Amino acid sequence: MKSKLQFKWLAGFALVLMSGVAIAADLPRQMVEIYRIAPGQHVNFLKLIAMYDAANVEAGLPPRQLYVHADGASWDFLIIQSDDDWTPAQRTKVAEALKRMGAPTGAKFFLEIRKFMAEHTDTVATGPTTAAQWLKQLE
């Protein structure tokens, strides 16, 4: 129970980490992912994420924002990435890059990444913004 509460708190905290302000009517969607890694699998997890980041960059998309645990709760890595839809061209470029790299995709990715995780959670949020900017949506 304590672990689940910590993950929920961390997801909220992640939103604070995303600095900058967007116009309230045009907030981007962000995927916030929190990972607790299986013992001894930290390097392998980061290598897999680095491969997917390289595919993003090759397709003209930004790499994920990675935060590494320094103190406090029981998580290891926090990742923030865009949840906005990619164009068909971007999807094709990412898929081609991943295939060329030999990276697992689809069901194989689902199984591969879970080799490294003890626990994870993800959520979609809008932002970054401020309370004042967000409240303007109510006008």
How should each PLM-predicted stretch be described?
Residues Y67-S74:
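A short beta-turn/loop motif at secondary-structure boundaries
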Residues M18-A24:
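Sec/Tat signal peptide C-region and signal peptidase I cleavage site
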Residues P28-R36, L78-I80:
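Active-site-flanking beta-strand signature of metal-NTP-handling nucleotidyl enzymes
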Residues K2-F13:
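Bacterial N-terminal signal peptides that target proteins for export
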Residues M51-L66, S82-T130, L135-E139:
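An amphipathic, aromatic/His-enriched active-site/gating alpha helix that lines ligand/cofactor pockets
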Residues A24-R29, V57-E58:
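Short, low-complexity N-terminal intrinsically disordered segments enriched in polar/charged residues
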Residues R36-K47:
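Short, surface-exposed ligand-recognition loops at beta-strand->loop->(often short) alpha-helix junctions
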Residues W75-L78, W134:
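Short, solvent-exposed polar/charged micro-motifs at secondary-structure junctions
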